[in-house]
Amino acid sequence: MEKKPFVTKEQVEEIVKKYPTPFHIYDEKGIRENARKVKEAFAWNPGFREYFAVKATPNPFLINILREYGCGTDCSSKTELMLSKAIGCKGEEIMFSSNDTPPEEFVYANKLGAIINLDDFTHIDVIDKLIGIPETISCRFNPGGLFSIANSIMDNPGDAKYGFTKEQLIEGFKILKAKGAKNFGIHSFLASNTVTNDYYPSLAKILFELAVEIKNKTGCHIKFINLSGGVGIPYKPDGTPNDILAIGEGVHKVYDEVLVPNGMGDVAIYTEMGRFMMGPYGGLVTRVGNMKHTYKEYIGTDACLSLIHI
């Protein structure tokens, strides 16, 4: 598949007459078309929401474009929560997923009405003492071991610092329910920047089966399942991009096979994509200052590493 820039050299030459380099430029049309396709891909699920991963591109103007398509914000720090508040996000439009979390960030997230996604079993006691247990609460699951798709190892969750073990998750839900929680979410992130249409459906199957088991063992009402991020983009011109419509239908198929027969056809699906939502539609415009020809070719520009996003 041939990949072409969304802006021509001639257009850039005109733009730099007004805006000095370095700067980022974005394809608004591309962002909107992709957001529309994501919404279409999961239209079969009435409760679906994409929570854009703010860390991927913390630009309020761009996030507001996504909000026009029903997107919320996925935050992992107080700064990201503050940005979300500043652009008008509130309540369950905000998902707060963090680890090694300072107590004051839980307090601030709760003040905004955000859904809190706990990363650690010990955080149950922490938030209970800080803010009490919210009616809606989510927990992050780490299955451990290796995560494979079609016999290909995608990642090693067992080496990751994130999430509850299965045993901790079941016990945690029991404790949270006893302390007043009424609506529960399950979240998991098992691989980064996957370029395959099978990642979300494979992850969904794991989480859907887990949700059924948890419901049967705890009686908890599973309100949503959050597939998090991990849907990637090709970085080379000849790479094949993910087909979000095929991905959405793959998740739909597993949903109908696992959740619906178990009386869980009301579970909402959430995602937290960042790179997939914004990565292909932005570029860094920089000017070459020097070219050095030694054992390798070196190009010196007026940009630096801190300006490179995603």
Descriptions of predicted regions:
Residues 76-79, 97-100, 136-152, 183-188, ...:
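Non-cysteine beta-strand/loop elements that form the S-adenosyl-L-methionine
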Residues 20-22, 91-92, 107-115, 151-164, ...:
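Glycine-rich tight-turn/loop motif centered on a GG-T
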Residues 63, 85-86, 106-108, 127-130, ...:
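Short acidic, glycine/serine/threonine-rich loops at helix termini
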Residues 31, 55, 77, 109, ...:
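Conserved, mostly hydrophobic/aromatic
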Residues 195-308:
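C-terminal active-site-proximal or functional interface alpha/beta core segments in diverse enzymes
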